[in-house]
Amino acid sequence: MTAQTPIHVYSEIGKLKKVLLHRPGKEIENLMPDYLERLLFDDIPFLEDAQKEHDAFAQALRDEGIEVLYLETLAAESLVTPEIREAFIDEYLSEANIRGRATKKAIRELLMAIEDNQELIEKTMAGVQKSELPEIPASEKGLTDLVESSYPFAIDPMPNLYFTRDPFATIGTGVSLNHMFSETRNRETLYGKYIFTHHPIYGGGKVPMVYDRNETTRIEGGDELVLSKDVLAVGISQRTDAASIEKLLVNIFKQNLGFKKVLAFEFANNRKFMHLDTVFTMVDYDKFTIHPEIEGDLRVYSVTYDNEELHIVEEKGDLADLLAANLGVEKVDLIRCGGDNLVAAGREQWNDGSNTLTIAPGVVVVYNRNTITNAILESKGLKLIKIHGSELVRGRGGPRCMSMPFEREDI
């Protein structure tokens, strides 16, 4: 990394030097059973314990010499002038689907009154309950304000924010600022926009943009993997479509970030396998975790770029052989989540046994609860850093989902 390139990520396994997290906040306490599906949750984590688990995760990374950054802090540091701060508030409000002009005005006044930038950022993440707003005089209400909904929020919370992998993805020295699958999560990308536009270190054009949140097709960071300095992997999944991948790849190749080929993985389109990194992660030079249930239906395409055109070939051979050839290793070991036991594989994949964070070649952060997968990984010679995640896992994401590398050593 240099002063001109504050982002440097050319692998999934190079020694991790700097990483972005988001400590779960009050947005988690704004989950309620009636609206879990709307907010893309299956259950409600207990915030106090989720924070303890997340703090332990962050400390485990620090203990390995990794600098931990926080999304909420970088976003606050990006509001460098009163004008930028006000522009952020107005853009946040314009994307918040607020019902009623008077309600929007009341929320703007509430946010403008918050003096501390980090408190402001955390409030925008938490959402706004209608009960927090002053009673609006009938004479000021528009029709939308008068037709009162029983929905308790004036602005939805963003409970998925602790999965920092998805709103944007670091690729080489650039960043893909994503357009996300759902309206609920697409608002999360606003923080990345302000960080990479205005932050003293990461803003001001220092980081090339290879995808923009204003695109109309969807892509999420869980489907963007950097296998080596030459090869990327992308998932065509429930959350990422092929049109987005084509746009991303053209931009990456045109901006000369150094990548020569992309492997596009097409697999089952459902919540259980929402991203590529929930079923497939790299843990060493020649080792990957994989969920066995995707192997039969998996299709892989090789994509290269020449004469300003993408060239796409469907790969017909064995996946392990394909990966070995593209990574320049003799053989690749695909380590099955849950081993060969169908029940264990299903249970441990649901609990993110395949969603590992590699912090150095062969050194992997995992949830301790996935005992069968962990035992297999250890039998393959991998060093595991095991963290508790009984509350964090309720959001359906593991250590890779909860982290966004900003700097890795080259391999």
Swiss-Prot record:
Keywords: Arginine metabolism, Cytoplasm, Glycoprotein, Hydrolase. Pathway: Amino-acid degradation; L-arginine degradation via ADI pathway; carbamoyl phosphate from L-arginine: step 1/2. Pfam families: ADI. Belongs to the arginine deiminase family. One of its GO terms (cellular component) is cytoplasm. The active site is at C401. PANTHER family: ARGININE DEIMINASE. One of its GO terms (biological process) is arginine catabolic process to ornithine. It is an enzyme of class 3 (hydrolase). Gene3D superfamilies: Arginine deiminase, L-arginine/glycine Amidinotransferase, Chain A. InterPro entries: Arg_deiminase. It comes from Streptococcus pyogenes serotype M3 (strain ATCC BAA-595 / MGAS315). One of its GO terms (molecular function) is arginine deiminase activity. The lineage of its organism: Bacteria, Bacillati, Bacillota, Bacilli, Lactobacillales. The keyword Hydrolase applies. Glycosylated. It is found in: Cytoplasm. Its EC number is 3.5.3.6. It catalyses: L-arginine + H2O = L-citrulline + NH4(+). The keyword Lipid metabolism does not apply. This is Arginine deiminase.
